[in-house]
């Protein structure tokens, strides 16, 4: 798409003044993302960038050959999260001798999934997605550790703050309740 845009712009060069700089941002969905690195390396200077327009491929949004246009923000923030829930493993026949990280992680996940539905204004947009969960290898053994992670997305800083505060409160509460 970038090469196509470059070809079109070159073909209409006499119709605009100034300079066009095409920038490919790598790693836009991971933290800290490619934008920070590009800015630090001076991509917005020499020549100075006065305006910037973003483009992203969204294969489900339009049919082949169509382009959509939107003024203002069109994509959300991306906040990745990873948790390691540590406990004391043991045999499943003696759960009283364990501190079960599977149960604690499950409770955290269920409660975190409720954040958007119960703590974010319904007029705002937010997404909380769990992408991975790992713990244990045997069905009759309570593991000592469970790891899970995912991503949250929002348009506003206030919603990002609500989600972050709620995630921390849930983690602390489950930790206190689980021993």
Regions found by a protein language model. Give the residues of each.
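Short, intrinsically disordered, charge-balanced linker/junction segments flanking boundaries
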Residues: 175-179
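Alpha-helical scaffold elements within enzyme catalytic domains, especially in hydrolases
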Residues: 8, 173-174
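A conserved active-site cap/scaffold subdomain adjacent to cofactor or substrate pockets
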Residues: 139-164
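Short amphipathic alpha-helices in soluble, non-transmembrane regions
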Residues: 162-172
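Histidine/acidic-residue-rich, glycine-tolerant segments that coordinate divalent metal ions
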Residues: 1-3, 9-143
């Amino acid at each position: 798409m970038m090469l196509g845009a470059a070809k079109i712009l070159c073909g209409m060069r006499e119709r605009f003044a100034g300079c066009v700089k095409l920038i490919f941002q790598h790693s836009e969905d991971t933290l800290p993302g490619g934008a920070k690195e590009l800015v630090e390396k001076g991509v917005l200077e020499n020549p100075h960038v006065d305006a910037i327009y973003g483009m992203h491929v969204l294969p489900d949004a339009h049919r082949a050959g169509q382009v959509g246009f939107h003024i203002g923000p069109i994509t959300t923030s991306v906040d990745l999260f990873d948790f390691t829930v540590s406990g004391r493993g043991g045999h499943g026949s003696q759960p009283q001798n364990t501190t079960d990280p599977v149960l604690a992680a499950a409770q955290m996940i269920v409660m975190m999934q409720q954040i958007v539905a119960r703590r974010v204004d319904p007029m705002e947009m937010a997404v909380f997605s769990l992408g991975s969960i790992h713990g244990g290898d045997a069905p009759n053994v309570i593991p000592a550790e469970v790891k899970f992670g995912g991503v949250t997305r929002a348009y506003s800083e206030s919603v990002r703050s609500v989600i972050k505060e709620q995630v921390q409160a849930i983690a602390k509460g489950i930790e206190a309740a689980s021993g």
